[in-house]
């Protein structure tokens, strides 16, 4: 299990990492996860669109992460045990599923075979849900997509917090952390997230720990 204190994200056996560039290298995500039990992948800020509760860029990052985990786990991949995805908005669920379908076609093509159908079914059966509705048990990998693109959306994202030992703790992030058996992967835009105290501490910890800038 993750050795993590909820209030401070003190990770004696874990490290936060902020490398968007790993997505552009072969097996970069897998190498990142081999070194880090908790990872934060910085996504670029998305411009204005009509769909305020979706984030296509984050969906594509999550899909790339899913496909690299899927490839690295090979025959041991279990849709009920390996990956769970948590997002704040239901609209983002379909966006992520479509991105996973597109990433699958890019990786494996459109060949119609029993093997391909079985692989697609495994990916379609991955649990993707909101924090409020997520009823899944623990997964080896939990991917938490923040989705938000504007500061005002942080009010919804952080509307459920509690105090413990004088620290404000975000319940939604806490749920994601408690569902991660081996790895917690967070995807979000640091420029927006840093405007919240809790998320700012998380990202600053990542910078100080790895001496890297958030991109």
Predicted feature locations:
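Short mixed-charge
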Residues: 19, 24-28, 102-126
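Amphipathic alpha-helical transducer elements in NTP-driven molecular machines
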Residues: 59-63, 93, 128, 166-177
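Conserved helicase/translocase motor-coupling segment
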Residues: 24-98
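Conserved motor-coupling elements within RecA-like helicase/translocase cores
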Residues: 110-142, 149, 161
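Conserved coupling/interface region of RecA-like P-loop/ASCE motor cores
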Residues: 1-12, 19, 88-90, 178-179, ...
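Short glycine-/polar-rich loops that comprise or flank the Walker A/P-loop
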Residues: 35-36, 123, 138-141, 180-183
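Helicase C-terminal subdomain and adjacent C-terminal extension
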Residues: 151-215
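Conserved small/polar residues in nucleotide/adenosyl-binding loops
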Residues: 8, 18, 22, 212-215
């Amino acid at each position: 299990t993750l050795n993590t204190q909820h209030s401070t994200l003190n990770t004696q056996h874990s490290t936060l990492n902020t490398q968007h560039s790993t997505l552009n290298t072969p097996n970069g995500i897998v190498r990142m996860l081999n070194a880090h039990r908790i990872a934060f992948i910085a996504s670029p800020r998305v411009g204005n669109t009509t769909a305020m509760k979706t984030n296509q860029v984050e969906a594509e990052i999550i899909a790339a992460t899913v496909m690299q985990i899927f490839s690295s786990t090979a025959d041991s991949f279990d849709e009920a045990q390996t990956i769970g995805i948590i997002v704040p908005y239901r609209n983002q669920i379909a966006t992520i599923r479509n991105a996973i379908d597109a990433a699958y076609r890019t990786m494996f093509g459109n060949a119609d075979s029993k093997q391909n159908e079985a692989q697609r079914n495994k990916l379609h059966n991955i649990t993707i849900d909101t924090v409020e509705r997520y009823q899944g048990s623990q997964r080896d990998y939990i991917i938490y997509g923040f989705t938000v693109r504007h500061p005002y959306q942080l009010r919804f994202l952080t509307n459920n917090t509690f105090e413990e030992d004088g620290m404000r703790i975000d319940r939604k992030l806490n749920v994601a952390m408690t569902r991660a058996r081996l790895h917690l992967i967070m995807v979000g835009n640091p420029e927006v997230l840093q405007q919240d105290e809790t998320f700012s501490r998380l990202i600053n910890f990542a910078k100080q720990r790895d001496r890297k800038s958030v991109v």
